[in-house]
């Protein structure tokens, strides 16, 4: 059966359906990459908190700690376990973005996802170019921080949105070629790509986090979690913001804001598979369109126009005939007269 072109809205709704129909598997797959980052940072903060609280008594007990270099070294050492967990989880999160792309064929055929380890291994085997691609992405993100480049980088972000899909489905391309390929695919489809980016951005970065945060507030979960981190918040230095014309911010507000930020970040990361599915489907759609356009152009080049056919027939008929020598002789005699 011939494949029908899908509209951006059709792809958006299908991506949502595929994500939520495999929600339990995606939650399980993303749990360590997402919660591992939170656990790693939490461990760093927790150990640092107890370290600073007990530092005076430790210095009294162990005179060797009464040295600046020793304190710095010890401060670094106590954060290493948490940092190790965070880095491992963060790397797995980056790999998951590429791995979920390669699961698309199975999802479209059966509606299910499976064999996560095999798809993850496909990306890890290409870790060097994968890191190179993320390095380019990091440079672009740093440039985008500058307000002078917001408009330009915002436009380029639309054109470069498919770089990781290109990396997954066209493994022969280098990171720089992936960027160029994404730009070529989106070219001519900017409005549709921007619409998809806006839709999935609003859903996964705004609506879902805000709905869950609202439910947490109503259930008192935000207050409960805020109270748990109050001992750490209380260690923050007091700053008189009123002298700068800024209203005073209470410690409770800081704790609530911290919890809401963490909850929103967790939900945004858990919806990574939805974004990955959507952009993989959009890549396939644009890639198929580009292939058909190239095929049509090639056929047109092979099909000769009527004038070209007429010229070719004329050349075949007269091109190889020799000019009569008598004609040349008569022409030269006329020139002499």
Ranges and model annotations:
Residues 25-51, 88-91, 136-140, 195-211:
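Hydrophobic alpha-helical transmembrane segments of multi-pass membrane transport/permease proteins
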Residues 83-91, 147-151, 259-271:
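Hydrophobic alpha-helical transmembrane segments of multi-pass membrane proteins
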Residues 66-92, 251-259:
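Membrane-embedded or membrane-proximal helical elements that form or frame transporter/channel pores
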Residues 15, 90, 94, 138-159, ...:
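Hydrophobic, aromatic-rich membrane-embedded alpha-helical segments
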Residues 1-28, 114-121, 322:
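N-terminal juxtamembrane cytosolic/stromal segments of multi-pass membrane proteins
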Residues 2-3, 14, 51, 55-62, ...:
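Juxtamembrane transition segments at transmembrane-helix termini in multipass membrane proteins
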Residues 16-35, 127-131, 187-195:
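Membrane-interface helix starts
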Residues 72-77, 81-82, 114, 118-142:
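Alpha-helical membrane-spanning segments of integral membrane proteins, especially the hydrophobic core
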